[in-house]
Amino acid sequence: MNRDEKFILTITAGSHLSVHCFMLVFPSILLVLKNEFSVGLDVLGFIATLSALMFGIGAIPSGYFESKVGGRVLLLIYQAGTIVATMVIVISQSLWMLATGLALLGLFCSIYHPAGLTLISRRISNISKGMALHGIAGSLGLALAPVIAASFTTLFSWRAAYGFLAFVNFVLAIFTFFLVPKMKKMIVKEDHRNTKVTNKMALILYYSIGIFMGITFAGFTTFLPTHFTLQTVEWSGSPTLRGGILTSLVLLSGIIGQLLGGYFGSRFDKAYLLFIIVVLNVPFLALIGLTSGMMMIFSGIIFVIVHFSMQPIGNSLIAQITQSNHRGVGYGISFFFSFGAGGFGAGIGGLIAEHFGVAKIFPAMSIILIPAIGLAWLLKKKV
């Protein structure tokens, strides 16, 4: 990569890291909030769904406006907006105010992905590698969030965790304001990967797969910290911190998945790889809830590696099957289905947790994912 490409990747990667930190603090403190507000996991699950739905809904107009106002403006709106939303969360004294703050947080976080991914797909010569490195930053955000949430909650309060992330985005906004304008001086090369016609059928199939993958991932991430906390009660240490550290350990392995996805995605047929990934997700997701101890943690690590390998492959596949002018909207719709519609997995998981126990969420989510195998097989034939 040349200097300009590295510059773009650094800015987008930093924003990607903070996005996922913001979105995963809430799942990491579910048991704390359950006790503080005296509510069930089903109620908290639907609040997580509300935040995820806003995370998805905002991605569609964001994809459209990316081509109108540019990535710099959208990044600044994301950073400033999340600071405001976080302040609402920090001062919240009721469950409704907390839910409002989380909904606003999801909405402003939704701005990032279409802008960042479109910048990479248009201005990074090696898309698969760029998507992989960008994804690694997101994986770091996911991995750091439980530790940040658990540490601040244990030492201070859960509100301090959100306040810390607001400060991080404030610093990031300063860097964006002063450094990103240099992108205006760049000469944007004609997109040599430009697809003349969008493959609509392939795109519909990909979006459909994204819904199922999103549902299962939302259920997984929302209740994994709680599951680990409850399954390791005999271990020493703070329950919140213990669940956070184990969750971070598992999610950190997503970096391996990102690297593998970037490596194989640039060498083999992306649609075929996607099919294999969907198939492998099913058994390892189920095993998280069907096993205990080290086998449970090992199953979680393998699942995360497999699941996260899809991101660079899937994002590159969208670039392959969409016309360049439609790409921002294409990414926006993709994230709407994956994070918005898929976000209902948190609500479904909450209902399962209240009626059958947290451990049953994971095999249930693996069953929900089975139709995606057939859709991935059809996609393989359409690309």
Predicted regions and their residues:
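Residue-level signature of mid-helix packing/kink "hotspots" within the transmembrane helices
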Residues: 24, 52-60, 142-143, 251-259, ...
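Extracytoplasmic gate region of multi-pass secondary transporters
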Residues: 26-27, 202-255
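Conserved MFS/SLC helix-loop-helix module at the cytosolic interface between two early adjacent transmembrane helices
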Residues: 57-93
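Helix-to-loop junctions at the C-terminal end of transmembrane segments
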Residues: 58-70, 257-269, 353
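Cytoplasmic helix-loop-helix junction between adjacent transmembrane helices
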Residues: 101-138
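Symmetry-related core transmembrane helices of the 12-TM Major Facilitator Superfamily/SLC fold
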Residues: 160-178, 362-378
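C-terminal transmembrane helical hairpin of 12-TM major facilitator-type secondary transporters
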Residues: 268-317
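A late C-terminal transmembrane helix in Major Facilitator Superfamily
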Residues: 321, 325-356
